[in-house]
Structure formats: C-alpha cells, structure tokens
Amino acid sequence: MAELPQSRINERNITSEMRESFLDYAMSVIVARALPDVRDGLKPVHRRILYGLNEQGMTPDKSYKKSARIVGDVMGKYHPHGDLSIYEAMVRMAQDFSYRYPLVDGQGNFGSMDGDGAAAMRYTEARMTKITLELLRDINKDTIDFIDNYDGNEREPSVLPARFPNLLANGASGIAVGMATNIPPHNLTELINGVLSLSKNPDISIAELMEDIEGPDFPTAGLILGKSGIRRAYETGRGSIQMRSRAVIEERGGGRQRIVVTEIPFQVNKARMIEKIAELVRDKKIDGITDLRDETSLRTGVRVVIDVRKDANASVILNNLYKQTPLQTSFGVNMIALVNGRPKLINLKEALVHYLEHQKTVVRRRTQYNLRKAKDRAHILEGLRIALDHIDEIISTIRESDTDKVAMESLQQRFKLSEKQAQAILDMRLRRLTGLERDKIEAEYNELLNYISELEAILADEEVLLQLVRDELTEIRDRFGDDRRTEIQLGGFENLEDEDLIPEEQIVITLSHNNYIKRLPVSTYRAQNRGGRGVQGMNTLEEDFVSQLVTLSTHDHVLFFTNKGRVYKLKGYEVPELSRQSKGIPVVNAIELENDEVISTMIAVKDLESEDNFLVFATKRGVVKRSALSNFSRINRNGKIAISFREDDELIAVRLTSGQEDILIGTSHASLIRFPESTLRPLGRTATGVKGITLREGDEVVGLDVAHANSVDEVLVVTENGYGKRTPVNDYRLSNRGGKGIKTATITERNGNVVCITTVTGEEDLMIVTNAGVIIRLDVADISQNGRAAQGVRLIRLGDDQFVSTVAKVKEDAEDETNEDEQSTSTVSEDGTEQQREAVVNDETPGNAIHTEVIDSEENDEDGRIEVRQDFMDRVEEDIQQSSDEE
C-alpha cells in the first residue's frame, strides 16, 4: 500500500478532533438545516425550493412543471443534498393536511393522511400557489440580503420578504442537535389581527393578543380541549395542547348506534389510528364494537365509521377510544426559531415582534430602493427636458462630434449634464422630439417628483411606514384570510373521566329477577292516574320479571348490595342504555357477582367520600347496622363485604342517611317499628349489626326507610295485589330498637302481603313494577291517605298470576308537571242511576295507544266501608296487645 505524502497528514488528538467536528456539525444542523428563521418561518431547504420555483417562473398562472425538473434545479444551484430530501420537503408543502396554507400547488399523487407516500418525482408536477407569491413579493427590490450559494457561482436569499407571518401560519417542526422545534399552525386572519394590534400597542400583553389569536388552527380541523395549554405555550414558548377528533354518535336503526369520525387530530396517521382501534378490539381491551370501516372519499372527506353493539354504551366506547387511541392526542409546543442566526425559545409576542420588525425592514428597504429608482429616473428626465429645450444645439453638437465618446463629453461640458443624462440623450429616438412626447416627459417628471416626496415622507416618519405595513397586511388578510377550522372547547379537560363525555340526566335503572340490567331515561315514563294499565317497561323472558328499580343521575354512583352482604359499584352511565322493551344485559357482564349471589338493593350516591352520611342495613331476620358511607369509597370490580350475618340470613335493604334520622323497618305481615338512628352505633364495614325488630313466626323484613324526627312525611304501603295507601309518619310512635313494632296495614286475601314500605312527601311519582314487566307511573298525591290499619286502595289492576314485584319513587320533573292530568268522569243516566265510571289513562309514549279501564263504583264504595270497620277493629286489637306487652 502506498504511503500518503507527509504534507497531507495532520496529527491531532482524537478528543479535540471529535469535539470540534461535532460542534461544527451541530451548528450546521441548527442554523442551516433543522430550524426555521423567525422572520419567514422557513428552513433553508424550503426557502431554496420556493426561490427556485420563482426563478423558473412557475407562478400560479403558468402551467405545471415536472417535479424532477424543480428538484434538479434546486439541488444543482442551491441545495447540494439528496434529491429525495428536497422532493419530500416540496411534497409536504403541497399537502393540504400538513400545511394550513400550502405553498406548493401539486398535481398528481402527493400522498395522503393514511401515510401513503407521494408518487415518484418523474410523475408529479408542481408550481407555486397564490399565497406563495406573498412570501416572495418584492424580493428583487433589495428588500433582503442575498448570499453566495455552496460553490459561490450563484446567489440565494438569506431570508424571504414574507409578506404574511408564515412561521405561525404554517408552523414548523424539526429536530436539530440538542434541541427541537414544534410550532403549530394558526389562522391567517387571527395572526394578522394580532400583528395589527401589536403595531398599535407595543406594550400589549399576551392575554390581550389571545383575544385576536384564539389558538392553533390545524389543517385537519378537529378540536382543542381547553385553553390552559394554549396560554402556557403562548406565554413560555412551551406547552402541551390536547387535540381530539370530531366524532358524533348516530342512530342506525333497530336501536343500534354508530360512531362517525369526521375530523382527526393534526399529524395523526389515519390508517394507523384505525389499526390501533382494531387491535384494541381484537385484544378485548375495548368491548362493544362490531364493525370498523374507513369510508373516506373526496366527496365526503374524512369518515371513519365504528358500529357499536346494541347493548353497548356508545359514549363510553368513544371515551375509551379517546383515551387509548390517537383519536385524542397532544401537540407538544416548543417554539424554537433562529433569531439573528441563533436558536432561541420565543413566546407568541416575541414571534410577532420579530415578524413585525422584519416587515418594517422590508418595507423600509423597498421604499429606499424605489426612491433610488425614482430619483435615477427623475435625473434622466431632467436631462431629456434640457435636450428638448435646446434641441437644435444638441443636434448640432452631436453632428459635429466624430465619435460617441466625443459627443457625450461635449454634451456634458456644454449643457452641464451627467454621464447618464448624456447617454440617455444619445439613446433618445427622434420621435421623442415631437410635442406630444415632450408633454409625456413633463407629466412623468411631475409624477416622479410627487412619488419621491411620498417615499421620502415614508422614510422620514416611522408611523407612516408602520401604517403602510398595516395596510399591506390588511390587504393580504382580506385576500387570503379564512374561517377557523379547529374548534376550541372550553372547560377542564386535564383529567378526563368517562362522565366528562356523557350528559348528566336523570335515568332509571331496572334489574330483573334473572339478573338482567339496563337503563332508560326517566322521561320515558309519563305520570298516569291510579288504576291504569301502565306502560310495557320490558319484554321479559319466560318466568322473569323486573325485581328492582332505582332513579339516579348518569354521573352518580350505583352501589349494588347483594343478598350475601357484598357490595359492588358502577357509574350510572356504565349501565347500557337500551330500549324500553329490551330485556337488558346480564348483570354479570357489568359486575363480577359470585355464584348464587343476587342483588337485593341498588342505591344511588353522589359523593362516596362524604363524612356526614351513613348507610343503614337491614336483614331478613331483623338485624340492622349503621356504617359510615366513606367506608365504601373504594370498591373494587370484584366487590367487597358490606355486612356479615348468619348463614340463614340475607340482606334485604340499605338506606343512605344523614346520621340524624329515624329508622323505619317494615315486615311482610304489616308490622312496622320506628326508632332513632342515634341508637345505632356506627360499625365497621364488615361488622354484623344488632337486632332491629323482633319478628313473629313466619314474618320477615321487607322494607327499610328513614324519616326526620318531626317529619310531615308519610309512610307508603304497597301490597302484592296492587293496593296501597299513605299514612302520616307521626302516626307511628318512637319505640326502642328491637321491639315487635305496630300494625301498619290489614293483611287480607284481597290485598295480600306487604311488598313495599317506604316514606313519601306527596311530591313524588311512584313507579310500580309487576312480575310481568308492566310499569306504571303514578303521582303519590293521588293515592288515598288512610289510617294505619286500613287495607288501602287499588293502585294498579293486575292480570291473572300477576303481582307487584317492586316499587320505586321518582322525583317529578318539569315534563310531568306540564302533562295534562287524565280525568276520571262520572255521568248520571236519565233514570237517575249512576253509570259505571271510566278512567282513561293516556300513555303518551310513542308507539302506545290509549288504554281504557272500567272501574265499578259500587265495588269501591264497599271497599271503603270494609276498610273503615277493619281500621277500628285493628286499633282496638293494638291497644290490647300494647297493654299486654307493658305488663
């Protein structure tokens, strides 16, 4: 191997060489490759491409030219790097989903939002867009400095005039050495309004600037969640902006829904987003999606359709998609740009200040250039005027001269002309000697004098120059400004939960005997008069019926207490919303019940962390327990123990209390005991409890409720055969915990055993559910008020083998208050006898007809007389029993 000549070998320490070479490389990447200039918002490769297009005359009014021709010209003259890097930069400037205001007008395949690459440069064509001309306008009027290209044979601009704020309009992104930039695009109208406000008030604050510039405006539209990230980025130059797709939930028939995505976040690859959704569905991380397809087209724009299973909650699925897929992502703002050739982190105001200063410089240099040109032209015109005034002498002098040089010198000496003036006279054509041409020269000269005065006035007064900048920016705003694409949604979105996407509304959750659960809007049911047939609430399976019902808000917690004394928790919206006739979904799909475990009580709670509330439990054997609500704030999906009891016992009911209530416990044989809650010592979550009521043989607890000490509430009793009544709470005296209680109704074959004992105010509605799935909604005020021992009046007519399975209270809403009360009318026949009364129950729910029931008045009167007699006998029997107990 031949040795290298000694003169070409330079021995250096490797550490020093690596340090210096890396610094040189790093500085080259920072200042000449990866970071944009704060003035025109362009990196060198983009600036060279646009300048090359301008030099080749590829303006919007000219035909397209091959991309390969553009790339080759730029690479050969200005950018000695790979042709693919130049082409990729040009392609990006042509993509309307990458640039808010594209700078290249491409023809052919220039890629897609799915990450598809552009066609080869030999196939595509390009030219400048109209707005690009504003970046290059006045570039030939000495408005910017030119520098040598890489080999010194060409000149290229160091910066473009940039007649609009391109740095913020189209944004920028790039990775340098030790730093990176990521600037979001903005709306041109808002940006120019911000620059105008800054020009009028240099001390303007960023908060005031944000009145003009709301926030980033992405080319793919979408949503921005909140303004806190925007404000932080504008104030410090760094911040995180939450972006979200625009998605709507559509009905697709048969009670099914679909999620349709029409806008996606900026820089999100649509194809990868769809793949991510499919992956989550395949891995069972998101449940309820049956189909996923991309229906995007040139006609419809972006359209990604996600079909949702009938029993799934589309809103919750959408929220999960936001959390786990690029449907929602963040844009990390890092506003680093080159300021005076050095990288600097800038905020919003600094970016606008530097741009405004650049525009003032451009306009000033352009004015100076125009002034020089105007003065030069005026100087020539002055020479022509002299020549016209002495035309004969001028001609004689020229004729006497032997050469052009002699003629020029003679003209200069004789008429005191400059070299340029003398040359202009020599170049003047004979036709300029006519009178008409003389008038034109005079007019042009006078116009030039006025123009020179205007230019000098601009240069003499900074405010006049600034107003010229404002006028030109306003003109650009009016020509190219457009409406915002990205919507900014205000609100706290930093820690999004499921309920943030779900409107808060009153709902009804029903649970069937075979553990099928669903939810419905409470407005599904309308108030009816007592005695009505009701509304079909669900189509139950064979031997199944609605066993429990509770009303709550979609944002409330639902605590599920089981017969085995365990507790589970769901949010209201987590229960699928289904049609009124749907049977629901198996409850085991929502909560993880153990074998042979049945839900005995559902209650709604807004704040599980409350220290002022308690839960009171009652078991079938008469055991009660009080426990702080906060003991149940952390419930796992597999549940926790809520109360312990003997094997032959089970949990009947749970109530939420304030700690100062009276406890009412009712039994199936119509016994009721009332005692102060304060007599119950708070116990731990897994404690057993104490005796609440002493039960007679064959009796069991069926109801638990609470009332205030001086309550004007009433005790509502409903029996299994559809009878009910109201009795004032104060008719039930306070007694010691553990007693046998007092009678609250007379049990006969006619009305049956008690199925519900609860307290009411008279301002609620009552929802009664039968084992056949029929639901009726009544105004509690329509139910008769009777004594403790009365049997009650008929609330709902039952068919064969039907019985009341559950009862729930519903708060009256505005819709029910506006409903017209259905009237029961009584008519008298011509012979004076009272005809049968007909109660018409109007079910206004769509798809249901008017139901008509015949009520026998004689039967009702007889029932009333029997109730009065029975009430008297029961009171006598109670007094005798009480005396025996006291003895």
From Swiss-Prot:
Q: For this entry, list what GO says about its biological process.
A: DNA topological change; DNA-templated DNA replication; response to antibiotic
Subunit field text: Heterotetramer, composed of two GyrA and two GyrB chains. In the heterotetramer, GyrA contains the active site tyrosine that forms a transient covalent intermediate with DNA, while GyrB binds cofactors and catalyzes ATP hydrolysis.
Q: Could you tell me what this protein is called?
A: DNA gyrase subunit A
Q: Does the keyword Isomerase apply?
A: yes
List the CDD domains hit by this protein, alphabetically.
TOP4c (cd00187)
Q: Catalytic activity annotated for this protein?
A: ATP-dependent breakage, passage and rejoining of double-stranded DNA
Single GO MF annotation: ATP binding
Function, as annotated, reads:
A type II topoisomerase that negatively supercoils closed circular double-stranded (ds) DNA in an ATP-dependent manner to modulate DNA topology and maintain chromosomes in an underwound state. Negative supercoiling favors strand separation, and DNA replication, transcription, recombination and repair, all of which involve strand separation. Also able to catalyze the interconversion of other topological isomers of dsDNA rings, including catenanes and knotted rings. Type II topoisomerases break and join 2 DNA strands simultaneously in an ATP-dependent manner.
Nucleotide-binding among keywords = yes
Tell me the ranges covered by the Topo IIA-type catalytic domain, including all copies.
Answer: 35-501
User: Pfam families of this UniProt entry?
Assistant: DNA_gyraseA_C, DNA_topoisoIV
NCBIfam families this protein is in?
A: gyrA (TIGR01063), PRK05560.1 (NF004043), PRK05561.1 (NF004044)
**What is the uppermost EC class here?**
isomerase
Q: Which family does it belong to?
A: Belongs to the type II topoisomerase GyrA/ParC subunit family.
User: What gene does the UniProt entry assign to this protein?
Assistant: gyrA
Instruction: Return the EC number.
Output: 5.6.2.2
Q: What are the alphabetically sorted keywords of the record? A: Antibiotic resistance, ATP-binding, Cytoplasm, DNA-binding, Isomerase, Nucleotide-binding, Topoisomerase
Q: What residues sit in the active site?
A: 123
The UniProt annotation puts motif GyrA-box at: 528-534
| Predominant cellular place of this UniProt entry's protein | cytoplasm
Which PROSITE patterns does the entry link to? TOPO_IIA
Q: Where is this region: Disordered?
A: 811-864
Q: Kindly state one GO CC term assigned in the UniProt record.
A: cytoplasm
Give the PANTHER family listed for this entry: DNA GYRASE SUBUNIT A, CHLOROPLASTIC_MITOCHONDRIAL, DNA GYRASE/TOPOISOMERASE SUBUNIT A
- Cite the record's Acidic residues compositional bias ranges: 813-823
What does the record give as the organism's lineage? Answer: Bacteria, Bacillati, Bacillota, Bacilli, Bacillales
Please tell me the species this chain comes from. Answer: Staphylococcus aureus (strain USA300)
